[in-house]
């Protein structure tokens, strides 16, 4: 059997269109547009690309967008001071600090300085704690985007055996919480997991986020399983591939996300959703 493709580009476009429609309605009602501030420290090329995509998405949906490109020489105190200013800015509903940060700046201290109601990346301990308690507010963008993909494709997750391959703070751990919330029996695997193949082979739903091209062979995929590939890996040839052997897995899975064009577009679309949510839930008068 050949898997159905989960078209992240199309679904992300739908999500952005829904956000844009809501913004237009807000403006028609005499309310302000939501505002997003993006902070980048240094000149990392990949970060520049990501920040650019977020700015374009803001323009598309009608948000107020502010970008702060700080030099490598910026110290932690200066960055925290900017966050404090944005926390107090009534026009800004979401604050995003682009990672990675230069050496000498404490990621945790910076992310925890963002007010939880403006934490549109969903990384603040308060928001992660809410997700853990099954009462989420602002949810991490990539995991929330994956849940949206599953919902929009009509994939019923209740009772599924789900295996999360990767345990990062950005994807793996919050994704496992999202899968629990979606009714899955959830296993998290990581670099010290023994018999990874056995875990993957029994999974009804596989989410892979390890950053290693072709890490999950196609033959490990149980016939009929759903495969969500978060990996974005550029080969020496320039080709971009995921963490799962797509060709092999697509012959066995029922649904699969391509790379590129699967999970990636949903991360930015979900950021737009989170910013709108922050505006309407926490900052409207």
Curated annotation (Swiss-Prot):
Gene Ontology CC annotations of this record: cytosol
GO MF terms, alphabetically ordered: methenyltetrahydrofolate cyclohydrolase activity; methylenetetrahydrofolate dehydrogenase (NADP+) activity
Function: Catalyzes the oxidation of 5,10-methylenetetrahydrofolate to 5,10-methenyltetrahydrofolate and then the hydrolysis of 5,10-methenyltetrahydrofolate to 10-formyltetrahydrofolate.
Pfam families in the cross-refs: THF_DHG_CYH (PF00763), THF_DHG_CYH_C (PF02882)
Annotated metabolic or biological route of this protein: One-carbon metabolism; tetrahydrofolate interconversion
Reaction(s) catalysed by this chain's protein: (6R)-5,10-methylene-5,6,7,8-tetrahydrofolate + NADP(+) = (6R)-5,10-methenyltetrahydrofolate + NADPH; (6R)-5,10-methenyltetrahydrofolate + H2O = (6R)-10-formyltetrahydrofolate + H(+)
Subunit structure: Homodimer.
Enzyme Commission number: 1.5.1.5, 3.5.4.9
Keyword field contains Electron transport: no
Record protein name field: Bifunctional protein FolD
Bilayer-spanning residue ranges: none
Gene Ontology process terms (BP): L-histidine biosynthetic process; methionine biosynthetic process; purine nucleotide biosynthetic process; tetrahydrofolate interconversion
Keywords: Amino-acid biosynthesis, Histidine biosynthesis, Hydrolase, Methionine biosynthesis, Multifunctional enzyme, NADP, One-carbon metabolism, Oxidoreductase, Purine biosynthesis
Binding residues for NADP(+): 166-168, 191, 232
Gene label: folD
Record CDD domains: NAD_bind_m-THF_DH_Cyclohyd
């Amino acid at each position: 059997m050949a898997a159905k493709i989960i078209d992240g580009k199309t679904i992300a476009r739908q999500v952005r269109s829904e956000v844009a429609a809501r913004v237009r309605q807000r403006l028609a009602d005499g309310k302000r547009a939501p505002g997003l501030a993006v902070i980048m420290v240094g000149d990392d090329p990949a970060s520049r690309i990501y920040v650019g995509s977020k700015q374009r998405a803001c323009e598309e949906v009608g948000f107020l967008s502010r970008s702060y490109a700080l030099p490598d020489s910026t110290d932690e105190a200066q960055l925290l001071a900017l966050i404090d200013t944005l926390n107090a800015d009534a026009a800004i509903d979401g604050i995003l600090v682009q990672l990675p940060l230069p050496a000498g700046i404490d990621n945790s201290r910076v992310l925890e300085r963002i007010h939880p109601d403006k934490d549109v990346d969903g990384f603040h301990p308060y928001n992660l704690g809410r997700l853990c308690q099954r009462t989420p507010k602002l949810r991490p963008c990539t995991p929330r985007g994956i849940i949206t993909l599953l919902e929009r494709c009509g994939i019923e997750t209740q009772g599924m055996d789900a295996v999360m391959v990767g345990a990062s703070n950005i994807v793996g751990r919050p994704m496992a919480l999202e899968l629990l919330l979606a009714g899955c029996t959830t296993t998290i695997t990581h670099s010290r997991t023994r018999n990874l193949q056995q875990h993957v082979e029994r999974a009804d739903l596989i989410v892979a986020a390890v950053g290693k091209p072709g890490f999950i062979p196609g033959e490990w995929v149980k016939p009929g399983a759903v495969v969500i590939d978060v990996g974005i890996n550029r080969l020496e040839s320039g080709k971009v591939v995921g963490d799962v052997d797509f060709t092999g897995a697509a012959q066995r899975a029922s649904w699969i996300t391509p790379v590129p064009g699967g999970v990636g577009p949903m991360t930015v679309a979900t950021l737009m959703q989170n910013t709108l949510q922050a505006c309407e839930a926490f900052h409207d008068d």
